[in-house]
């Protein structure tokens, strides 16, 4: 086991949009921190999405704190644009990042946390922020007969390009943005059906010349409980609804059973299928927190606005609807990270320094008094 003798202020688990946004705030306050991620480079799960994935918010509303998204502010960036932006962001602010480090366990010892990785490394910090987000564990619903299916079955996280399905009969499962976007592009090369449990809810991408996200920001509607409780609509310039209206895309109520060569619809009819693609979302992967009381029997994270209910010093950034509708988005993680900072700093004051006298003598700038002086000097 490679255990570092260095005691950090904060360990950030996750090097995607949430972890980098938090890193910027930690840096502004002069804290000693390290971002850990299982991937080699910053960018998080954006590296794993399908090639044509396009943001549903324009670049001007898709930036992390301290650095605008490059290019036309009215454009809608693609997946590779986001990856490049996140890499550039980490480099611009020289955020301390350690890749190829998959966290497998977090335990709390007295005033500090011990974070253990699969590669044998162990880190110690006074606080831990879980920023691995909500998109780390693909979710596929349990459907009778699914395991018997002989065709291609994959989650949208494994989908890349439509060419691989040319000439095939494909059913895409899901009613949100990714499902509709994937089905729409597949329809150019394949026979496609959308299977949904409820009707697809469309919302115009632009209203009176302004993007949907501009209205959310200006009206502050995204901060209301009402919007956070709503299912996510499909943002549409008109092409998706038109594709359904003209028959280019077809929607059917969710199938009830899977057969080796197809599916069974609610009316009992069968449909032969070559491929099933599940755009059914993700779940947070919090297995490394199994030693801490952070979840209930329903799988919900025990936190309020990013602060763990029962574990002092443990925080979250990037969970869906953590504080509002935007919490799991590029534009939302920065504000949520900023919200945590005064709470995290108060925790630092309560626990004091975890360094030994010998460590403080070697590096006096990392002592508590030095840190708090740094907090006062840096902007928030």
Question: Which residue stretches match the model-derived regions?
Answer:
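Glycine-rich loop at the start of a catalytic domain that most often binds anionic cofactors/ligands
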Residues: 50
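Flavin (primarily FAD) cofactor-binding/catalytic cores of flavoenzymes
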Residues: 2-15, 21-39, 43-45, 74-363, ...
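Glycine-rich flavin
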Residues: 55-73
